[in-house]
Structures are given as C-alpha cells and as structure tokens.
C-alpha cells in the first residue's frame, strides 16, 4: 500500500479514537485536570500506535518541499482565538501550496482536522524549515525553540498579567507569571515576529526583543459567520427590548464587573427594560463567577444573563440581537469580539485599554473612564441619537475592511516570504558565501 494510503487508514484509526474524546467534552471545557490527564493518555496511545505501525505524517512525506512550515501551539482549543488563528493560518498556508502542519501538546476533541499532530510526532527539522510559534502563556516548547536550526517566527498573542488572577485563580496566576518570564527569556531564540497588534509589538520591544517584528492581525475567516444564527435565541430576544452584549471568557482581566455596573446605571436611568448578555464559558464554582454574582446583587441589576457554554451559531445569534456591544476589558492582545461586533453591525462602546484602541482603529466609541453614570450616558446617546449611531456604524464598516481575509492573508504571506528570504541569506552567510545584490 502506498504511503498516502497508509496515512489515510491511520487517520481513520485516529478519528475513531477521537470519538472517545467526545464523551468527555463538557468536563474538558470546564478544565477538569483529571480529564485532561485521561486525554493526554489517549493521545500518548495514538503516538505509540503511530510508532508501532511505522506511519509517517503528511508533513514528513513532504520533506522535499521547501520550506516546510510548522505551527507550534501549546493546546488547540475549540473556539479559542489562538487556536482559531492557528487553524486559519494552516488553511491559508495549504492554499498557498506550503507543506504545513500543527504540532501541539493537546487537541480539543471537537476539532477534527487533518495534519494536526501531537508534539511527539514532530519530525527532525532543518535550517530550511520555518516554525510559527504561537505564544499566549507558559508552555513546554522553550527547549525546542532555543535548540532548533529552523527559523523561528513568533506569533505573539500576549500574556495576561498575573495580578488580574490574584485572589481568584492561583493556578492561572502562577502560569501567567511564569509565562512572562519565559517569553522574555526566549528573546534571543526568536528570529522574526509576526504579532497580532501594535500593542503586542511594543510589549516585545519593551522586553528587549531586537528581531524584526511585523504586525498582521488575527486571520478571521468571515465565511464562518455567514451561517444561520440560532433561531431560538433570535426569536426569544427579538421582542423590542434593548439587548446589551459582551462576548469573552469569564476571566478577571475582562472586567465583567465593570460591564455589569455600567449596565446597571444605564438600566436604572435610561432604559428599565434593557437586558445584559455576558456570553462566555465559566464554571459556577469559579471564584470570579461567584464574585460577579455578588456584584449583580450589590448593583441591584436584574436581567443579567450568562448563556454559558453554547454552540457557535448561538454565539452568532447573540451578536445578531445585540443593540450595543459593551467592553470594559483592561487587558487584550487583540480582542476578536470587537471585529465580530463590527461584522454584525453592532455599535461598540469600549474602554480604551491595551490593544483595544488599535483594534478599533478610530471606529466605535472609546471611553477613558469607567465611572458607571458617564459610561451609561454614552450608551444612551448611542441608542437614542440616530445620526450619531449611523456615523459609528459607518466608521466600523470602514475599519472592518482592514480585517478582510484576503488582506490579512496577503500580509502574512508577504511576511513569510521575507522570513524565507532571510533564512536563505542566513544559510549563505553560514556557508561563507556572498549575498546576491
């Protein structure tokens, strides 16, 4: 049987094993450590099976295609902005004719994607290969990055400052603190940067990075957003009441408490029928979620809804019914939901922090204060002043064009061409040859 045929049979075996992961999906999304251990064991079995059968990845079978481009991401999570970016880049590279694959320590069971492998299957790399290294938190790739002969391109998504987690999540606080130390310590091992925002570029420069750093936003396949939103959600909440929405993981740096406080002020003074939808995954036992429940009680806010873990088409439905997108986050490396709100023509009111002004690029409404009454006044103007609202949406539509798939695709491919050329120059220098003019 030819190698590609063996690979096809092997992929089916892996797919069958992946079905066993599905039954663990709910608990996995809740970050159950025991369950993650079970999944790692299953993935180890896949690795052992691969070795036993003598299989080779498609990536290895294309070893003669130069350059091969691999992406490293600590974990490939379902619905995660970093994972989505890695998958979108993979599809883009495949479409451009590159031999490419993603290597990771763990893959979410909902992700059924070819050429995604456990890191144990990483083949030997050469100076002709290119690594795109996604970084958002401490991971186990540092030794590989520091020792590889391949060209290393850092796709930096930023690390949440650990102080945000203090008092809420000790584990996250430790991981993020180690992550900041780790990323700073790898500055001499990185050859090139393609970061997702100017804020992230400045962050690396402040850490002492001296390699060339380009900015290319997260690659968003907007065709995915054209599917039909969840009809039940749209029908239930299209009743004439004002729907305020924020989308993001329920974590402290997103400052959900400030969203709730501003909503409560708006509801009390301007619109008693308004509702607030806080769309993001959480566990009811999380200390931060419990804190938010206390905030809601203290504010006396009613109609605050946490939809919880929902399907993608349901997330689209909440964007569809949104009258205003309210973001009070204090740390973002990019903030994809802002672009999603633009796509759904929802006016944005956002606190001017970190990467948010850069992502909005002069669109939306930036507020410099979190004083609830002042933010509520801005919200009310957006809702009541038709001309003002129309101007906001017009600027958001213009800004959205900057994130067009083909535009960002071109930017990333251009940067990869530069990396490829710099790699050839590097090899020539190592061989003592003169560079061509």
Language model regions located:
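Glycosyltransferase donor-sugar binding loop
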Residues: 104-108, 273-290
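Short alpha-helical donor nucleotide-sugar binding micro-motif in glycosyltransferases
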Residues: 309, 317-322
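Donor nucleotide-sugar binding/catalytic pocket of nucleotide-sugar-dependent glycosyltransferases
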Residues: 187-229
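Conserved acidic donor-binding segment of nucleotide-sugar-dependent glycosyltransferases
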Residues: 365-372, 381-386
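Short hydrophobic beta-strand element within catalytic cores of glycosyltransferases
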Residues: 338, 347-350
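Aromatic "clamp/platform" in nucleotide-sugar-dependent glycosyltransferases that forms part
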Residues: 330
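Conserved donor-binding/catalytic core segment of Leloir-type glycosyltransferases
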Residues: 194, 235-254, 260-263, 277
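Nucleotide-activated donor-binding/catalytic signature segment of Leloir-type glycosyltransferases, i.e.
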Residues: 289-313
């Amino acid at each position: 049987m030819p190698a590609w045929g063996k690979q096809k049979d092997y992929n089916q075996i892996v797919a069958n094993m992946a079905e066993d992961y599905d039954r663990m999906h709910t608990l996995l999304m809740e970050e159950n450590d025991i369950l993650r251990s079970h999944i790692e064991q299953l993935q180890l079995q896949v690795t052992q099976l691969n070795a036993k059968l003598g299989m080779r990845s498609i990536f290895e079978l294309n070893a003669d295609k130069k350059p091969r481009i691999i992406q490293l991401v600590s974990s490939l999570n379902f619905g995660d902005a970093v994972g989505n970016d890695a998958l979108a880049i993979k599809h883009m590279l495949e479409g451009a004719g590159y031999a490419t694959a993603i290597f990771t320590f763990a893959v979410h069971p909902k992700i059924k994607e070819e050429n995604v492998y456990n890191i144990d299957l990483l083949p030997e790399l050469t100076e002709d290969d290119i690594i795109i290294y996604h970084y958002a938190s401490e991971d186990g790739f540092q030794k590989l990055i520091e020792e590889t002969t391949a060209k290393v391109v850092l796709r930096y998504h930023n690390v949440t400052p650990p102080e945000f987690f203090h008092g809420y999540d000790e584990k996250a606080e430790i991981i993020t603190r180690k992550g900041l130390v780790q990323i700073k310590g790898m500055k001499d091992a990185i050859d090139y940067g393609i970061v997702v925002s100017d804020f992230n570029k400045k962050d690396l420069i402040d850490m002492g990075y001296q390699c060339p750093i380009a900015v290319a936003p997260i690659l968003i396949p907007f065709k995915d957003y054209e599917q039909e939103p969840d009809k039940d959600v749209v029908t239930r909440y299209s009743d004439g009441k004002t729907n305020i929405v924020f989308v993001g993981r329920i974590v402290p740096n997103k400052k959900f408490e400030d969203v709730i406080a501003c909503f409560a002020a708006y509801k009390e003074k301007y619109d008693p029928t308004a509702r607030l939808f806080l769309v993001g995954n959480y566990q009811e036992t999380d200390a931060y979620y419990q804190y938010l429940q206390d905030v809601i009680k203290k504010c006396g806010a009613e109609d605050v809804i946490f939809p919880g873990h929902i399907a993608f088409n349901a997330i689209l439905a909440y964007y569809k019914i949104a009258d205003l997108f309210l973001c009070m986050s204090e740390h973002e490396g990019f903030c994809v939901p802002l672009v999603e709100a633009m796509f759904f023509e929802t006016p944005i009111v956002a606190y001017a922090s970190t990467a948010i002004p850069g992502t909005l690029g002069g669109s939306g409404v930036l507020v410099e204060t979190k004083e609830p009454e002042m933010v509520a006044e801005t919200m009310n103007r957006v809702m009541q002043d038709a001309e003002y609202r129309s101007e906001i949406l017009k600027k958001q539509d213009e800004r959205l064009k900057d994130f067009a798939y083909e535009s960002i695709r071109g930017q990333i491919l251009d940067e990869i061409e530069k990396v490829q050329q710099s790699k050839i120059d590097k090899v020539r220098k190592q061989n003592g040859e003169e560079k061509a003019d």
